[in-house]
C-alpha cells in the first residue's frame, strides 16, 4: 500500500512537472508567434547604450532612404524593430546620452533663434531633430551652435522632431508588447532628462544683443 501511494505521488509530481514545462513551452511559442522575442520574457533592466557607430548608421541610413520627417520616423521604427530587445533599449539610452550632452544654454539660444522661440519641450524636440540630421551635423553644431546656419532649409519654419523621441519606445512596444522604460536601469544610467543640469542663462530674449553675442551668424541671418 505504501509503495502504491509513493508511486502515485511520484506519478502526480512528474505529470505536474511535465504539464508545467509544456505550459512554459506553449507560452513561449505563443509569444514568438505574436512577434515577442523570447528573450524579453527574462529581460533585465539595462544601462548599456547601443554601439555608437551602429546607432549613427541607422540614423544616417534613414536620412538617405527617406525624404520627409514622417517617412524617416517610420523607417527608424522599422529598423529598430530588427534589433534585439536589449539593443532597442540601447538605442533609447544612446539617444538620451546625446540629448544630455547637448543640454546647454548656448544651443538653447541657437534653437530659440532658428525656431523663433523655444520652450522646454521645444528644446528637447529641437535636439531630437539635430540628432536626426546625422553624426557630423550633431557634433559640428554641438561644438559650434552657429553652424546650424548650414542646416537651414529655405521655406522651413520648424526645426523639431518630436516623433524621434519615441521611435525606440514604439519599436519596443510593437515587438514585445511591453513598455521600454520598464527595462531601463535608472540607478546606473543617469544621463537622462531627470538629471539635466540647472542652466544659468547669460542671454535674454528681452535683450537680443545677448543672443547675438552667443550666435552672431544665426542672429544676423534669422533674428526678426
Residue ranges and their predicted role:
Residues 23-85:
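N-terminal leader/targeting peptides and immediately adjacent processing regions
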Residues 56-61, 93-97, 101, 121-136, ...:
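Short, hydrophobic/amphipathic alpha-helical patches that form generic packing surfaces
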Residues 112-142, 148, 153:
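Hydrophobic/aromatic-rich, well-ordered segments within soluble, folded domains that form packed cores
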Residues 28-37, 42-44, 56, 180-224:
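Long, solvent-exposed, polar/charged low-complexity segments
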Residues 151-201:
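An amphipathic alpha-helical core segment
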Amino acid at each position: 500500500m505504501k509503495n502504491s501511494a509513493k508511486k502515485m505521488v511520484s506519478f502526480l509530481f512528474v505529470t505536474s512537472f511535465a504539464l508545467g514545462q509544456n505550459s512554459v513551452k506553449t507560452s513561449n511559442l505563443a509569444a514568438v508567434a505574436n512577434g515577442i522575442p523570447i528573450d524579453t520574457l527574462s529581460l533585465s533592466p539595462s544601462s548599456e547604450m547601443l554601439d555608437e557607430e551602429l546607432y549613427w548608421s541607422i540614423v544616417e541610413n534613414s536620412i538617405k532612404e527617406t525624404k520627409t520627417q514622417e517617412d524617416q520616423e517610420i523607417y527608424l521604427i522599422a529598423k529598430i524593430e530588427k534589433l534585439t530587445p536589449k539593443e532597442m533599449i540601447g538605442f533609447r539610452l544612446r539617444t538620451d546620452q546625446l540629448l544630455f550632452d547637448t543640454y546647454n544654454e548656448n544651443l538653447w539660444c541657437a534653437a530659440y533663434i532658428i525656431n523663433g522661440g523655444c520652450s522646454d519641450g521645444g528644446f528637447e524636440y529641437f535636439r531630437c531633430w539635430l540628432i536626426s540630421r546625422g553624426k557630423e551635423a550633431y557634433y559640428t553644431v554641438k561644438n559650434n551652435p552657429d553652424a546650424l546656419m548650414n542646416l537651414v532649409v529655405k521655406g522651413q519654419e520648424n526645426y523639431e522632431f518630436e516623433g524621434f523621441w519615441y521611435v525606440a519606445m514604439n519599436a519596443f512596444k510593437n515587438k514585445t508588447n511591453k513598455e521600454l522604460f520598464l527595462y531601463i536601469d535608472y540607478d546606473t544610467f543617469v544621463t537622462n532628462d531627470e538629471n539635466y543640469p540647472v542652466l544659468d542663462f547669460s542671454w535674454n530674449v528681452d535683450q537680443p544683443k545677448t543672443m547675438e553675442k552667443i550666435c552672431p551668424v544665426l542672429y544676423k541671418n534669422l533674428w526678426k
